[in-house]
């Protein structure tokens, strides 16, 4: 009886671990399919940095203090530019 219980619990634990690993692999493969190539991500990063610094320069030329622009999507404002966090 004791051995049967141990065998059932062991099989259940293996099944749970296997299912979790399979779900992680499936999620990773979906991210890889949906994600942008690295070159496109670099272009987006450069574009955001440029937009933030240009908008800050425009505010300065208007004799206003440069307001920290709220950056979104993993970015923060630092030194009047959007910086990837």
Curated annotation (Swiss-Prot):
Keywords: Disulfide bond, Neurotoxin, Postsynaptic neurotoxin, Secreted, Signal, Toxin. It is found in: Secreted. Expressed by the venom gland. Residues 1-22 form the signal peptide. Residues 23-48 form a propeptide. The keyword Transmembrane helix does not apply. Disulfide bonds join 52-66, 56-77, 71-82. One of its GO terms (cellular component) is host cell postsynaptic membrane. Postsynaptic neurotoxin. Belongs to the neurotoxin 12 (Hwtx-2) family. 02 (Hwtx-2) subfamily. This is U4-theraphotoxin-Hhn1y. It comes from Cyriopagopus hainanus (Chinese bird spider). The lineage of its organism: Eukaryota, Metazoa, Ecdysozoa, Arthropoda, Chelicerata.
